[in-house]
Amino acid sequence: DLGKGAVPGEKFEEMGRDFEEGLVIAKMLEDAGYDALDADVGCYDSWYWNHPPMYFEEGMYLPFNKRLKEKVSIPVLTAGRMDDPDLAVKAVREGATDLVALARPLMADSFIVEKIRKNRREEIRPCLSCQEGCIGRLKQYLHISCAVNPAACRERELELKPALKPRRIAVIGGGIGGCEAARVLRERGHEVTLYEESGQLGGKMRLAGAPDFKKDDLALVRWYEVQMDRLNIPVHFNTSIQEAEQLKWADAVILASGSGASTFDLGNCI
């Protein structure tokens, strides 16, 4: 239906240009002298295809672009959730695409290509395909950013500079907020110790990553685990901070003990 989406399993007809018409247009563009085709799927009437969110499959343009390559002789570029290095390499090697294009993954981690080249894949900060900082802000006419990398597109303004006076800082809470605070502080040269009441990092992000289409949420948790190891940040698991005396060694304390659920009263409407 025009301008509408559907939930999984719902039957509906998407409006817009169909694939066969797209192939005809692609050939016309090649004949007109185009050097390459950066081909994606969808149009303004089904815009979520252009910027596939988390519930779309990774590499969801590949079946279409593989058929496109059979119709044209110029290079074909493929984007659309192609940030998995193994998927990208396999797609090129198997002839599904000539080049892989990245946009949102570069906002999540601008060094993704360098890390792939140097075989440091575990250090790649994952894109969640959540649309919060990029497409979501763009639709509000705000400067784009990234939910997992607030410095995206503002690298000069938010550059991490060495602290003039390194301090000893305790971070209470090993969720995403606490881990990010610990990481940034350590990158700037502070001495950081992280305390987590449970036996693992990630907090409520682990619950958020329970659906199979949100596995990138768990990948972000894993990324923070790698960062804690890389930066040699001491993490005290199964430790509850109850008294200020426990942290008397610290110059400052950051409380990141977790978020609360938003609730609202529906009254008698159900």
Positions of the model-derived regions?
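Glycine-/small-residue-rich beta->alpha transition segments that form the dinucleotide
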Residues: 250-252, 256-263
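Beta1-alpha1 glycine-rich phosphate/pyrophosphate-binding loop at the start
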Residues: 171-238, 262-264
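Alpha-helix C-terminal capping/helix-to-coil transition sites in glycosyltransferase folds
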Residues: 96, 248-249
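A conserved short coil-to-beta-strand element within the FAD-binding core of flavoproteins
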Residues: 236-248
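Structural alpha-helical scaffold elements that stabilize or flank donor/cofactor-binding regions
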Residues: 93, 227, 245-246
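Flavin-dependent oxidoreductase catalytic cores
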Residues: 1-172, 176-192, 200, 260-265, ...
